[in-house]
């Protein structure tokens, strides 16, 4: 499969383009609004073609799919533009800035006959796959989930992640992982209560703490921040045991990963060989395109996660719990 890369964002340059190149697929073209920047990245990574506009890349008839690592607030427009060209789309999380917009871009891609998948790479790591398997089959009913993804964004940073016009904020950048993990183990919550704080007077949340409640009695606590040392974990308490992954999301592809769980009076730590989650994500996306199968991160999951994020922001604004239908 021939991939075009819309933008020269760090996650693409450092992780996704190398993942495409390590697979049986090809990063065939890259675009930037700064043609010199596109050419420099193309030369550095061995990409055959560089374009000075996103429109020019989308007009390249040799491409089968695009990867979109643009700022959050630009995702929806470029997903639609790619679909108009008949290109399949792997788009960075969060897919859009709201649940309604997420549903709308899935509708658009379905009408265009192209596959759309949101790029939550951690969902493709064997650690996550095993955690989901254990919770579903061996540990009993889930009582609670606690998940946090935080890191320290340098003070004074001129960064798209704190730009309100580009759908920035800690929830959109890393809190979405915590919400995704809660959904993986518990599903969509029935109500949400959350607080957010803008510690930098930048117009977006730089800290979030939320409680997701379920009619079953289960709860999830989700947190994110731009103000603390890096933290990325989930912990699951069940009726018959517990489970923890730390680190859980952006796992070093050159290092082994560990998953610890307890049940029947024993504690087990499973170790996973170094794994490139991004490569597995790319391969899974391409397989979905080629076979017509539903992507692992599908419409239902993407809309559900975004509905919860919408509720987090609404609750933080109103100070009240938000019911999800």
Curated annotation (Swiss-Prot):
GO CC annotations on file: extracellular region
Induction remark: Expression is highly induced during growth on D-xylose.
Residues spanning the membrane: none
Catalytic activity annotation: D-xylose + NADP(+) = D-xylono-1,5-lactone + NADPH + H(+)
Consequence of gene loss (knockout): Does not affect growth on D-xylose as sole energy and carbon substrate.
Keyword Disulfide bond listed: no
Keyword list, A-Z: NADP, Oxidoreductase, Plasmid, Secreted, Signal
Family: Belongs to the Gfo/Idh/MocA family.
Record note on quaternary structure: Homotetramer.
Role: NADP-dependent D-xylose dehydrogenase involved in the degradation of D-xylose, a major component of hemicelluloses such as xylan. Even if it shows D-xylose dehydrogenase activity, it is not essential for D-xylose degradation.
Protein name: D-xylose 1-dehydrogenase (NADP(+)) 2
């Amino acid at each position: 499969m021939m991939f075009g890369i819309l933008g020269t964002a760090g996650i693409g340059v450092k992780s996704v383009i190398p993942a495409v190149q390590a697979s049986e697929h090809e990063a065939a073209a890259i675009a930037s609004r700064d043609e010199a920047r596109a050419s420099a990245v193309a030369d550095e990574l061995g990409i055959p073609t560089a374009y000075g506009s996103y429109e020019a890349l989308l007009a390249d008839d040799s491409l089968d799919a695009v990867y979109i690592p643009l700022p959050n607030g630009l995702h929806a427009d470029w997903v639609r533009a790619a679909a108009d060209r008949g290109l399949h789309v792997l788009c960075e999380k969060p897919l859009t800035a709201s649940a309604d917009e997420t549903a709308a871009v899935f509708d658009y891609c379905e009408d265009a006959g192209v596959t759309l998948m949101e790029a939550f790479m951690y969902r493709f790591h064997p650690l996550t796959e095993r955690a989901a398997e254990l919770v579903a089959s061996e540990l009993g009913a889930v009582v609670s989930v606690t998940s946090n993804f935080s890191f320290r964004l340098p003070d004074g940073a001129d960064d798209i992640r704190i730009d309100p016009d580009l759908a920035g904020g800690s929830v959109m950048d890393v809190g979405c992982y915590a919400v995704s993990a809660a959904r993986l183990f518990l599903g969509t919550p029935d109500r949400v209560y959350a607080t957010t704080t803008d510690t930098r007077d930048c117009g977006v949340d730089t800290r979030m703490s939320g409680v997701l409640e379920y009619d079953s009695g289960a709860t999830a606590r989700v947190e994110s921040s731009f103000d603390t040392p890096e933290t990325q974990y989930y912990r699951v308490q069940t009726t018959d045991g517990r489970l923890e992954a730390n680190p859980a999301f952006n796992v070093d592809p050159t290092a082994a990963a560990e998953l610890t769980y307890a049940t029947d009076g024993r504690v087990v730590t499973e170790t996973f060989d170094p794994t490139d989650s991004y490569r597995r994500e790319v391969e899974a996306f391409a397989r979905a395109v080629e076979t017509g199968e539903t992507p692992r991160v599908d419409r239902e999951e993407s809309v559900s996660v975004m509905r919860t994020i919408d509720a987090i922001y609404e609750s933080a604004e109103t100070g009240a719990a938000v019911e999800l239908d």
